[in-house]
Design a protein with these regions (language model features):
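Auxiliary Fe-S-binding modules of radical SAM enzymes
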Residues: 1-26, 79
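Feature marks short, surface-exposed loop/turn motifs that line or immediately flank catalytic pockets
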Residues: 130, 153-155
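Conserved, mostly hydrophobic/aromatic
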Residues: 34, 43, 101, 124, ...
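Conserved Radical SAM active-site core
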Residues: 30, 48-141
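Non-cysteine beta-strand/loop elements that form the S-adenosyl-L-methionine
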Residues: 139-153
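N-terminal pre-triad scaffold of radical SAM enzymes
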Residues: 14-52, 56
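Electropositive phosphate-/nucleotide-binding environments in soluble metabolic enzymes
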Residues: 9, 33, 37, 71
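Short glycine-rich anion-binding loops that position phosphate/pyrophosphate groups of nucleotides
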Residues: 39, 102, 151-152
Length: 156
């Protein structure tokens, strides 16, 4: 799994949490949950309100990432999570992208799949509030979909 050669990547993800060694909640085996910023929905009972916060603040010298938010490219995320490679391989686990709405980061997730290879499972915990084109883009690389249908009442 370990490779000294980095793949060229072009996309970054804004992340507010990386939660390691999860079992039984975010897909098969042991997983790491990567919580992404941003969601087009504003559900009254959202479990991850943090995803709606501003990513940047304006300062005297430009824009700054707000406290607790990191931006990583696919290689950098891999470097953060590869410590659990043995757990992922032994249990059939891998990475679960959630947070916010992971389909907003489709190109980043594609790049992450290229970086991590096909041994780890990739799970999306999603509302599927995205275009059909995005689903078609992600379908070949996502192993498991956790579709979170909170309520079909348009008022909520």
């Amino acid at each position: 799994m370990e490779s000294s050669k980095k793949l060229q990547t072009y996309h970054t993800a804004s992340i507010f949490a990386i939660d390691r060694l999860r079992m039984g909640t975010d897909g098969h085996g042991i997983t790491t949950l990567v919580c992404l910023m941003g969601c087009p929905l504003r559900c009254a009972y959202c479990l991850n309100d943090r995803c709606h916060e501003e990513i940047y603040s304006k300062g005297s010298r430009g824009l700054y990432l707000n406290k607790g938010i990191i931006q990583l490219d696919a290689n950098e995320l891999y470097d953060h999570v590869k410590i659990d490679d043995l757990y992922f391989q032994a249990t059939g686990g891998g990475i679960c992208f959630g947070g916010g709405e992971p389909t907003r980061y489709a190109s980043f997730i594609e790049e992450f799949r290229r970086v991590c290879g096909n041994v780890w499972k990739i799970t999306l915990e999603t509302s599927l509030y995205c275009s059909e084109d995005t689903i078609r883009q992600l379908a070949p690389i996502v192993d498991h979909w956790i579709v979170d249908v909170k309520d079909i009442n348009h008022v909520i």
